[in-house]
């Protein structure tokens, strides 16, 4: 028999997506140059986009006795006992009718603590810690539900959720020599001053918890026709896996030399992920067709960039 075509369409009830945001903050001056700030932020996403196949008949619980009637000659162990969609369609001239809808929602709740020191005595820094939780029922416009008749079961941690995050950044001048600008009178220099003087160090340390990953069977187990695939292993909810925590240390070092009375030469060295720490950014989400997962299920399969270094020379006159 001929294969019916699939079409993409838009819902007739589309409306504009929008956000509802509320925040409050308290700031306290610990000293002349040091402040502590606590901030709470709520953000709700309303009428967010997602894709739903609206041409499916209601699913039927698959058993060994009705598998042939549902067009599945040899059901996989992961298919037995789960709702499976019949091969017939509501509109028979089409296979899938993938409708772009904006009925998804999201919520974000976050508490941030920030300790900031403004520039004084050649030192400034900022330390920020955030504890947050992001929940939604679709994290992207092309994300399809496992069961179009049970959209509420898609509500889970967002793919963008990161429960904890800490960032420290600062600028420090090494305590050697002076920071005279071109044209100023230079002081007498020792060997330590010549080597370590006029050096500015700017570190950035980022530490964060892992991010959710959606477990998948790796095939269209419930016959919903979704692509990207959305059939999950039995007993697993949406985005129920999590990558390991991440840590990255970046460093920028600048040393300048005064040239003549009005010139300055900057030598800059920058390194990203100085410690060459492996930051896992993705896991293999494929569980496989059996009741036991394949060996590589939930193992790392992608990582962030390794150590990178770059150098530059700037001349000011």
Language-model segments: residues:
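Short, solvent-exposed micro-motifs at the edges of structured domains
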Residues: 1-317
